[in-house]
A protein has these predicted regions:
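Flexible, surface-exposed loop/linker segments and immediately adjacent secondary-structure boundaries
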Residues: 1-17, 21-165
């Protein structure tokens, strides 16, 4: 975290950056939100309450959010969510977004705002150059979502064991 190794229980504060290495993942819980940060990823937490809650700068982040509004961002989109589970994978020129379940307001950079709801991975997207295009479900599983929901003190609507894609 912030260029130094983190230990279990290390607090995460506004302005912190969490990076994972090639063979490492990180799981962290902030209030009623839980996150599974994949290998080779970098996530930046906003510096003020007016800032974006978190920005996925590189790699993948599976997130489960409790009640209330949250905002995420990548280089190619700003994402407003509420009581939602999503997976984001940020690449240099494009981003992958899967609304696993919940509701989203998606604003691609220089593109039109898209609002939608899903119940089970119905609309994964690539976001690039202000446009969205259909995608397959990649790099996250129902079992990971079930695990994160348990860390956040909730149960998932998916059956135990979940699906793999």
């Amino acid at each position: 975290m912030n260029g130094k190794p983190a230990q279990e229980g290390t607090p995460i504060r506004r302005g912190d950056t969490i990076s994972t290495g090639q063979n490492s993942d990180a799981i962290y819980v902030l209030g009623d939100n839980a996150f599974f940060q994949k290998a080779d990823s970098r996530v930046d937490f906003g510096k003020s309450s007016a800032a974006t809650f978190l920005r996925v700068l590189a790699g993948g982040l599976l997130s489960v959010f409790g009640r209330g509004k949250s905002h995420l961002a990548t280089y190619s989109a700003t994402i407003g969510i509420r009581c939602t589970v999503c997976y984001i994978q940020a690449e240099e020129r494009r981003s992958y977004f899967c609304l696993c379940y919940g509701a989203v307001v998606l604003q691609p950079e220089n593109g039109q705002t898209v609002r939608y709801k899903t119940t089970h991975h119905e609309r994964p997207l690539w976001i690039e150059n202000g446009a969205t295009s259909p995608a397959s479900v990649v790099n996250h599983t129902d079992a990971e979502i079930i695990m994160l929901e348990e860390f956040a003190g909730r149960s998932s609507p998916f059956p135990p064991g979940g699906s793999t894609y």
